[in-house]
Amino acid sequence: MKIRNSLKSAKVRDKDCRVVRRRGRVYIINKKNPRMKARQG
């Protein structure tokens, strides 16, 4: 999982990326390509 300041660039990398909020943190998850996971830090 990458930790990034801005998730906008991470979201446009793949069309299956979803933005999810968990415990006050913002995550990018991708079921088809799990390598795209990222967290805003």
From Swiss-Prot:
Superkingdom classification of source: Bacteria
GO molecular function terms listed in the Swiss-Prot or TrEMBL record: structural constituent of ribosome
Keyword Endoplasmic reticulum recorded: no
Pfam families: Ribosomal_L36
Cellular compartments per GO CC: ribonucleoprotein complex; ribosome
Family matches, as HAMAP family: Ribosomal_bL36
Family, per entry: Belongs to the bacterial ribosomal protein bL36 family.
Entry protein name: Large ribosomal subunit protein bL36
Alphabetized InterPro entries for the sequence: Ribosomal_bL36, Ribosomal_bL36_sp, Ribosomal_L36_bact
Keyword annotations: Ribonucleoprotein, Ribosomal protein
Biological process, per Gene Ontology: translation
